[in-house]
């Protein structure tokens, strides 16, 4: 336990995926303000989020993003979907469109959102280097790439003198841990930080869902009533996942009794204290939300201490239960 207490806590990044979709501009402004008031400074968005509304809303908040005197870091991504690609022209179009929406001269971190298997990666990386030389972004990031692709990209960039990626954003939570086996050693070798998305498994690890719910009428959320819902159900909505959650809930009751933390709190505490994320390496957890109340609850949980060993063991048991059907971290 002393090792856990002394370990540097991973940073927290605000995930802006729901801005412009489940959160309107005033709510998004309140959420951003609450996040920054807690002392956090980094916001994650993407060209594709809410069809551009996420970036547009963030750009209208008066944060002076990308300015030399701005303490807020802004991250965005280019995607090879919906008529876009990672070819040089599309890459430039997406980044320059993002800069206009965000009303900033450059972003702090520019990700390749996922691999473009129809474009030679050398073309994409050369174009990224050119955009970096033009001052349009500070750091290069990768997301949803396989470990071997990360190694290939780092080697190509190094040998050609191109900007090297320094951040990898990937799917990671207490019951989705495929990244630990091969990706994490790769990232440590090449010196990339890891930013975790889906820390609550799209909301499944809040414990508010039941497996049978998929057959009934559901409110709009990550699993129902939106463009990405089927992808999230395919990723997480499996009987073994719900059995794993039940194991953890039982352990929470046994360890804490009437004062047991919520499933959400326990899951986030696992991320910050018991996962393989390391604050000393600059790793971070991306916290998404669909309301101000949800963000405040998640931020409070992120500031709490380590879990009882029996609960950590239960999370490990849950992981072993679902390992065989863990969704791939790469695309």
From Swiss-Prot:
NADPH binds at residues 17, 44, 49, 113, 143-144, 198, 200, 202, 208-209, 222, 290, 294, 298. It is found in: Cytoplasm. It catalyses: a primary alcohol + NADP(+) = an aldehyde + NADPH + H(+); aflatoxin B1 dialdehyde + NADPH + H(+) = aflatoxin B1 C(6a)-monoaldehyde + NADP(+); aflatoxin B1 dialdehyde + NADPH + H(+) = aflatoxin B1 C(8)-monoaldehyde + NADP(+); aflatoxin B1 C(6a)-monoaldehyde + NADPH + 2 H(+) = aflatoxin B1 triol + NADP(+). Keywords: Cytoplasm, Detoxification, NADP, Oxidoreductase, Phosphoprotein. It holds the Pfam family Aldo_ket_red. GO terms for molecular function: aldo-keto reductase (NADPH) activity; electron transfer activity; identical protein binding; NADP+ binding. The modification Phosphothreonine is found at residue 227. Gene3D superfamilies: NADP-dependent oxidoreductase domain. This is Aldo-keto reductase family 7 member A3. It comes from Homo sapiens (Human). The gene is AKR7A3.
């Amino acid at each position: 336990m002393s090792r856990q207490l002394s370990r540097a806590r991973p940073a927290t990044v605000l995930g802006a995926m729901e801005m412009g979709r489940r959160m309107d501009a005033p709510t998004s402004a309140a959420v951003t303000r609450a996040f920054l008031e807690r002392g956090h400074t980094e916001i994650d968005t993407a060209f594709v989020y809410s069809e551009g509304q996420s970036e547009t809303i963030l750009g209208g908040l008066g944060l002076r993003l990308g300015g030399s005197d701005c303490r807020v870091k802004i991250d965005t991504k280019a995607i090879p979907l919906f008529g876009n690609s990672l070819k040089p022209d599309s890459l430039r179009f997406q980044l320059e469109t993002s800069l206009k929406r965000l009303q900033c001269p450059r972003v702090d971190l520019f990700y390749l959102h996922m691999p473009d298997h129809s474009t030679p990666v050398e073309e994409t990386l050369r174009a990224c280097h050119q955009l970096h030389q033009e001052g349009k972004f500070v750091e290069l990031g990768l997301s949803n790439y396989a470990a071997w692709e990360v190694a290939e990209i780092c080697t190509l960039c190094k040998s050609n003198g191109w900007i090297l990626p320094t951040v990898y954003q990937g799917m990671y939570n207490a019951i989705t841990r495929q990244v630990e086996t091969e990706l994490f050693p790769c990232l440590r070798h090449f010196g990339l930080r890891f930013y975790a998305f889906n820390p609550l498994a799209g909301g499944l690890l809040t414990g508010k869902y039941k497996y049978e719910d998929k057959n009934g009428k559901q409110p709009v959320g990550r699993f129902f009533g939106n463009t990405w819902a089927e992808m999230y159900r395919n990723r997480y909505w499996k009987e073994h996942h719900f059995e794993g959650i039940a194991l953890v809930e039982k352990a929470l009751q046994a360890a804490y009794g009437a004062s047991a933390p919520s499933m959400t709190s326990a899951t986030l505490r696992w991320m910050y204290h018991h996962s393989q994320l390391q604050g000393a390496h600059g790793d971070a957890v991306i916290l998404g939300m669909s309301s101000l109340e949800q963000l405040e609850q998640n931020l409070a949980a992120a500031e709490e201490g380590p879990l009882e060993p029996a609960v950590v063991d239960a999370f490990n048991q849950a992981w072993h239960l679902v390992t065989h059907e863990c969704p791939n971290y790469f695309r």
